[in-house]
Design a protein with these regions (language model features):
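An alpha-helical repeat/solenoid feature that recognizes helix-turn-helix modules
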Residues: 1-9, 23-53, 67-160, 168-274, ...
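Extreme N-terminal leader/anchor segments
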Residues: 9-15
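N-terminal glycine-/serine-/threonine-rich phosphate-binding loop
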Residues: 18
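Conserved, well-structured interaction surfaces
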Residues: 60-67
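Active-site neighborhood of glycoside hydrolase catalytic domains
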Residues: 165
Length: 341
């Protein structure tokens, strides 16, 4: 009940951030990505495209053409989040001109992401990257997988490049860093908590989407993913201990990695109970988790974590469309379940 209440009040607070036109924004801009993220959050939390806030957000996305390639500084993030939002909206849309526009926009977003993939795998901010980073890359992969779930075809080499990239970029400790750096063909550098979770999710999604696809229930058994999950556990105490400020991006990354791989426990850690405890104690009486320029983004990340909503992976062997909305989480036990060390 506490989690349900936090989600309900959090959604109401998110809706208050919507502009009269229907869009959302962060940093005073990035309105396409912010609107896509907010719409995805509302729909993944059980909302309908007929709910006024969601309807206005969807209408704004469909009626305001994306400035393809005209800005470049946020393109991968924004295009990917619009793709995810559309993949959740389209199944609810009746056959109509609006649905056709949504599918056309989703197809164009997928085409852009394919063309923007770096030659060695991964994405950067722009359509013609000279390198990559793992933050943009996790959104690029999520956007492509969302498009696949809505019926868009993605060619095999796209996924093969990603599988190879994430396996070769994995560091000795099992984690990933912001960039993939190599010495004598061996990945070097320092892993981080958020990029390690991103690496697990990206490798899992890529494996589930490649010709030699793994069924969702087998993803956590993959040797590279298993090492990544162990690294996530090691990073948790340093990044999400009781005295640490909440890292909303990290929580969202952990949630996606664990949900895609079907991981309930990271070693001895119940990541959902621990993260939910932190979020429940950080939410203010108005349903807000954050203020300032990151408000929309962090509000959505908190809600998606609590709802355990994510872009699902489906393979030919389990091709029946799954409900993208995760079941309601179980009630939390009273108090903190365990002191973080």
């Amino acid at each position: 009940k506490k989690v349900d209440g936090a989600i309900s009040s959090g959604l109401k607070a998110l809706e208050m951030m919507q502009k009269p036109s229907g869009r959302f924004e962060w940093y005073g801009r990035a309105q396409y990505g912010a609107t896509g993220l907010a719409l995805y959050t509302m729909l993944a939390s059980g909302g309908s495209i007929h709910d006024p806030p969601a309807a206005k957000a969807l209408d704004w996305l469909l009626k305001n053409p994306f400035p393809w390639g005209q800005r470049g500084d946020w393109d991968t993030y924004e295009i990917s989040l619009v793709a995810v939002a559309l993949s959740f909206a389209i199944p609810q849309m009746p056959l109509s001109a609006s649905r056709d526009r949504a599918m056309s926009l989703l197809q164009r977003a997928a085409d852009w992401l394919v063309s923007a993939q770096w030659k060695g795998g991964g994405w950067s901010y722009t359509s013609k990257p000279e390198t990559h980073d793992h933050s943009n890359s996790q959104f690029g992969i999520m956007g492509l997988r969302a498009a696949v779930n809505a019926g868009v075809k993605i060619t095999t080499p796209v996924w093969e490049r990603e599988v190879n990239h994430w396996k070769t970029a994995q560091l000795k400790d099992g984690g990933w860093g912001y960039h993939a750096c190599y010495k004598d063909q061996t990945a070097t550098g320092r892993s981080t908590s958020t990029m390690t979770a991103a690496g697990v999710m990206c490798l899992a999604m890529s494996l589930a989407s490649s010709p030699k696809e793994k069924a969702p229930e087998d993803l956590a058994k993959d040797a590279n993913i298993a090492r990544g999950l162990l690294a996530m556990r090691s990073h948790w105490d340093r990044s999400m201990g009781r005295s640490a400020p909440i890292n909303f991006y990290l929580l969202y990354s952990v949630e996606r990695a664990c949900m895609v791989t079907g991981t309930r426990l990271l070693g001895d850690l119940d990541w959902y109970v621990e993260g939910s405890w932190a979020l429940l104690h950080a939410q203010d009486p108005d349903g807000l988790w954050a203020l300032g320029q990151d408000q929309v983004k962090d509000q959505c990340f908190a809600l998606l974590f609590l709802k355990r909503a994510y872009v699902p992976v489906r393979t030919p062997s389990n091709a029946k469309p799954a409900d993208p909305v995760s079941p309601a989480p179980p009630p939390l036990p009273p108090g903190r379940p365990r002191e973080m060390e």
